[in-house]
From Swiss-Prot:
GO biological process, one term: ribosome disassembly
GO molecular function: ribosome binding; translation initiation factor activity
Protein name in UniProt: Translation initiation factor IF-3
Gene name of this polypeptide: infC
Keyword Transmembrane helix: no
GO cellular component, one term: membrane
Cell compartments where the protein resides: Cytoplasm
Classification via InterPro entries: T_IF-3_C_sf, T_IF-3_N_sf, Translation_initiation_fac3_CS, Translation_initiation_fac_3, Translation_initiation_fac_3_C, Translation_initiation_fac_3_N
Similarity comment: family membership: Belongs to the IF-3 family.
Xref: Gene3D superfamilies: Translation initiation factor 3 (IF-3), C-terminal domain (3.30.110.10), Translation initiation factor 3 (IF-3), N-terminal domain (3.10.20.80)
General function of this protein: IF-3 binds to the 30S ribosomal subunit and shifts the equilibrium between 70S ribosomes and their 50S and 30S subunits in favor of the free subunits, thus enhancing the availability of 30S subunits on which protein synthesis initiation begins.
Length: 171
């Protein structure tokens, strides 16, 4: 809902389609008549569909309505999760212990719900043996296949090769 809804005198239309406080349709009334009806029950006249012909207005407690909307928006923001991409750097000639350390880090990131970008940087003549780097990345993907899916297969970009792993979702 928009934060600046038309309320009471802010409504510019001469005639409005009126909905009562309990949700029943009252019909097309003049703005003055609708405002009087709202004031008689100590509520506000709020335009809920200003683009309709005639605009649809509802009799409600605007302060309470705005508070409820803010609460809903806050809950929705709470439920949203930001996905971070963590990077793990490897080398094509990585030793087993170093590989296991990088693997442990990647698994930790994946278990927290983050994506992992595994990168291998080729230095000097190592670029001619890019298949060694590809094997290292595929090994990492295979070791993580129980908790992750491969989002982007190993691919070369300049002197680096990348692989992106995303955590498996429970759906």
């Amino acid at each position: 809902m928009s934060k600046d809804m038309l309320v009471n005198e802010g409504i510019r239309a001469r005639e409005v389609r009126l909905i009562g406080a309990n949700g029943d349709q009252i019909g097309v009334k003049s703005k003055a008549e609708a405002l009087d009806m709202a004031r008689n029950v100590n509520l506000d006249l709020v335009c809920v569909a200003p683009n309709a012909k005639p605009p649809v207005c509802r009799i409600m407690d605007y302060g309470k309505y705005r508070y409820e909307q803010q609460k809903k928006d806050k809950e929705a923001r709470k439920k949203q999760k930001t996905i971070n991409v963590k990077e793990v750097r490897l080398s094509p000639t990585i030793e087993d212990h170093d590989f296991n350390t990088k693997l442990r880090n990647a698994r930790k990131f994946l278990s927290k719900g983050d994506k992992v970008k595994a990168a291998i940087r080729f230095r000097g003549r190592a670029i001619t043996h890019s298949e060694i780097g590809r094997n290292v990345l595929e090994r990492l993907a295979k070791e993580c296949e129980d908790i992750a899916i491969v989002e982007a297969k190993p691919k070369m970009e300049g002197r680096s090769m990348f692989l992106v792993l995303a955590p498996k979702t429970d759906k």
